[in-house]
Amino acid sequence: MLRRDTNRGRPSRCRRLYGLLSLTALALGGCASEPPTIDELHATAMQSVGAVEPTLVAFRHDLHRYPELAGAEVRTAGKVTESLTKLGFDVRTGVGGHGVVATLVGDPDGPLIAFRADMDAVAGDALDPVPYASEVDGAHHICGHDIHTTIGVGIAHGLASIGDALPGRVMLVFQPSEEAGTGAELMLDDAVFGNTKPDAIFAVHAAPFPVGQMAVLPDGMMAGRMLVDVRVSGEGDLGSAVNEIREALMQADTVGMEQILAFQTEPFISINLFGQADDSDGNAAVRGFVMSAGLDYRPYVEQRIRSALDDLSFDGLQMQYSFKQALEGVNNDAAMLSRANAAIAAMAPSVSVSPVPGVIPAFSEDFGSFQRSVPGVMYMLGIDNPQAGTVGFPHSPDFVADDGAIRVGVDAMIAVILDAMQR
């Protein structure tokens, strides 16, 4: 369902007045006709965020208490829509399923900058050791998507307070079905960006670092995932052929577990064979997924596997194989990342940004699909609280994300968005 209102998409009259009065005060006696600096805009936005921080924490706790799995984010999308509509955003709903796209216009001729937040929860029965634990059987927020969504709403509060002084346009993309690996593609297929593609897109992902720390890597940061399907048929020895195929595929694997845990700085291939089948009609199949990363990794991966399989031959049997890209890798635009880091250092100096040690091979993220269409950067956002002894390792049974990460994420992303609006 699409929801449009011609009065939305620009801040309300009261909110514009509040924002302009705040910005006038920030000018500290300067000429009223001078446009505010982005530092002043950031300060105004964060003042507004500080005023609603308890509301944002309560919003996050509510999402955590009532998680929704991929493709079923009805309540979550409704809460997001309600919040952003009140803030004066133009809101589209039902994008790619239960996706929500909210746009705010300051300078209509300024750059369009997007921020993406995923909304869905993880299936399973985790411990969830927090006072606001999940009340939904079989669903828990143990990947931080409740934090991501709340950061998106926090950004909306901050930027709405700036009013017409916003030097561009912002698009907040609340994505469904990330855990299924399909949400980004579904939104892209449903014209998530409408008629105007953003100039840049940003995102954060919860990570096991202390609150106040963020981490990022230029170019390839998170592994992509490709499905490989090998089929043999005929009247030969199917069992022997399957074993040889499995062995050939595993020889194409370039990383062992020790290397995976240590991270990789070069392109790598990690193969997980998850399926094997044969039937009475003389057919057999070996299936698996290939996780890989690095610049231009896809041709490298395919060629390595093709070479391994093409060396095989079986008496009385024919072999066919195919590849299907399941998830794009997260590939951060290097120049955009450098500028974003500088913006965080200048406007949000309490946030520490460090390099990720190398490509993260153990996890995938479909944010890379958006990056295929729009240049962008994803940051890893620290959610640990060492004093409380809580650790937020995604998908772990004792996952806990500290509420303090909300303000950190909002602070950093508002800085990045405002800076990106400067031509």
Regions found by a protein language model. Name each.
Residues 63, 102, 115, 145, ...:
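Divalent metal-coordination and catalytic microenvironments
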Residues 117, 137-151, 203-209, 371, ...:
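Histidine-centered catalytic micro-motifs
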